[in-house]
Amino acid sequence: MDKIVIEGGVPLRGSVDVSGAKNAALPVIAAALLAEGEHEVRNVPDLADVRTLGKLLGHMGCEVARGEGDRRTVRLRVPAAVAPEAPYELVKTMRASVLVLGPLLARLGRARVSLPGGCAIGARPIDQHLKALTALGAEIRLEHGYVNASVPRGRLRGTVFTFDAQTVTGTENVMMAAALADGETVLRNCAREPEVKDLGDALVAMGALVEGAGTDEIWIEGVPSLRPLSHAVIPDRIEAGTFLVAGALPGNDVTVRGCVAAHQEALVEKLRAVGAEVTKVEGGLRVVGDGRPRPVDVRTAPHPGFPTDMQAQLMVLLCLADGTSRITETVFENRFMHVQELIRLGAHVEVDGRVAMVKGVPELSGAPVMASDLRASAALVLAGLAASGTTEVLRVYHLDRGYERIEEKLAPLGARIRRVRG
């Protein structure tokens, strides 16, 4: 099993490029199931989750390949007859596999999809997906770990539905289903993440009638059919945010190219509050970590609030602050699993339910640590960069689900980091 080895305490200087957003690429690729033909999705990161979705679509009868000479382009050929099943063997490692449910129901009128897996950071049930699809006219049964769904009337029908809680994949799944439904659908209390808007843009490019994607209310007028997809996904705001935090670590000066400043407002506000210098530059943002950080209080929230996917990374910065910070996690339960590993590096963190009190220490010291989930693994890499001595991050298969060769991006900045194949 691979591990990342870091010799920490070295200042980072230079520029790093952001890959395409995994959480935008996955629903856009799933949307290809809505239309027969040849599709092209650009700016797609080469990540384990993307490869898993490619295998899943291949299992359904689609042809999926990276472009020759352009590994960031994924080309798909979707046949008229698609096998409407997502087996457990493929779905178990990736929660986003459930995104095929809406497109399959909309186009084929039936689907059998295993209940999803992914990071173990809370229950994250798909009940909102199923309630909304039922409101669109689907009949759904949960049997033997599978969602068995059908549309007795042949086509889904438009509806007005209010999500009980904001859900990104739920919003995306129902958007795709409603694109081919009969009549008008109005979705309320929708997730407002940039990835939702990106999917809306992709659906419109396919001929769908969608308005309001990226706001809390989305209007969709179903159409009889859609045309093949051609779309470039947005940059990954969480990868960009991770590099921005790296730049804010004491003594660092990092320019993150390709990030969208509007997607980083909540994070940038906190980075400036801790004392980092953040400036807009052509094509991105520059962050300078000037001295020891100041403590801040952080509360995660759905977009446009502070992203839960950046909570662990920011905690690393606050572990070095001159004072005590408070982090409140409101989005997911059980999302402080990285704390025990940070304590191994010398951090002083106490957790009480959904609140972590972070008492800053002058420095961290390297040690072997084990990743528990995707964003925790990124936090441990950041901690290893800041710590003195050697840090080994184990179970980096979590890291590879969401970061495209992170060690190769950090090394040109001066980081002494390498992957050891196991």
Swiss-Prot record:
This is UDP-N-acetylglucosamine 1-carboxyvinyltransferase. UDP-N-acetyl-alpha-D-glucosamine binds at R95, R124, P125, I126, D127, Q128, D309, V331. It holds the Pfam family EPSP_synthase. It catalyses: phosphoenolpyruvate + UDP-N-acetyl-alpha-D-glucosamine = UDP-N-acetyl-3-O-(1-carboxyvinyl)-alpha-D-glucosamine + phosphate. Cell wall formation. Adds enolpyruvyl to UDP-N-acetylglucosamine. GO terms for biological process: cell division; cell wall organization; peptidoglycan biosynthetic process; regulation of cell shape; UDP-N-acetylgalactosamine biosynthetic process. It is found in: Cytoplasm. Phosphoenolpyruvate binds at K22, N23. The modification 2-(S-cysteinyl)pyruvic acid O-phosphothioketal is found at C119. Gene3D superfamilies: Enolpyruvate transferase domain. Its main location: cytoplasm. PANTHER family: UDP-N-ACETYLGLUCOSAMINE 1-CARBOXYVINYLTRANSFERASE. It comes from the Bacteria. Keywords: Cell cycle, Cell division, Cell shape, Cell wall biogenesis/degradation, Cytoplasm, Peptidoglycan synthesis, Pyruvate, Transferase. Transmembrane segments: none annotated. Pathway: Cell wall biogenesis; peptidoglycan biosynthesis. GO terms for molecular function: UDP-N-acetylglucosamine 1-carboxyvinyltransferase activity. Belongs to the EPSP synthase family. MurA subfamily.
